[in-house]
A protein has these predicted regions:
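Structural/interface elements that position substrates and couple domains in central-metabolism enzymes
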Residues: 1-187
Length: 187
């Protein structure tokens, strides 16, 4: 939505929020984008809508930033639905067919919220996994990002070491890939 037409959000049944959550200089998450958007749209929200957060957030952020504000106006799980479903786009992946094959994590504040989020994403994704809570889904996203960052860091360090020893890192990775378990290549 263009912010000039933000009032049209009341026409939507499902609102997906996926805004950046960069780190501040002190390494705390910058939540101002999320805080501003919920403040901006709350007055236009109506009963029976569903908000799904896709931004990368820390555990309990959905509750702190969204649920606490929305529960003042709505009965979450009864007349308004709140879910969290982290985006899982692979950097550099541009083929939509591959995107729809990624398992989509879904969660919601109540069983009814989880059911509604699940039904929505099953229209888009072949595989949907229901997390038992929003906090599990939030932490899973952080775990996935940490796993990737640690392994990219390891790959970079191994590359530097291989360069010093005049060994081709790509040949090392190719050889390591022959192990059928416990190894995943990172470039």
């Amino acid at each position: 939505f263009d912010l000039k037409n933000i009032n049209k959000i009341s026409d939507c049944d499902v609102i997906i929020i996926c805004l950046p959550t960069p780190l501040k200089k002190n390494l705390n998450p910058e939540n101002s984008y999320l805080e501003k958007i919920i403040k901006l749209i709350t007055k236009f929200l109506r009963e029976e809508q569903m908000i799904i957060i896709e931004s990368t957030v820390y555990p309990y952020a959905t509750k702190e930033i969204f649920e606490n504000k929305l529960s003042k106006k709505f009965n979450i799980g009864k007349n308004f639905y709140l879910g969290f479903s982290p985006e899982r786009v692979s950097p550099g992946q541009h083929e939509l067919t591959k995107y729809s094959n990624i398992t989509k994590l879904v969660s919601g504040r109540t069983k009814k919220c989880i059911k509604n989020v699940d039904l929505f994403y099953k229209k888009i994704f072949k595989y949907v996994y229901k997390c038992q809570s929003i906090e599990i889904a939030e932490f899973t996203k952080l775990y996935e990002n940490s796993y990737r960052a640690v392994n990219i860091g390891l790959a970079n360090q191994m590359k530097r070491l291989c360069d010093k020893m005049n060994i081709n890192i790509f040949d090392v990775i190719k050889a390591a890939e022959t192990k059928p378990f416990g190894f995943k290549p990172f470039y």
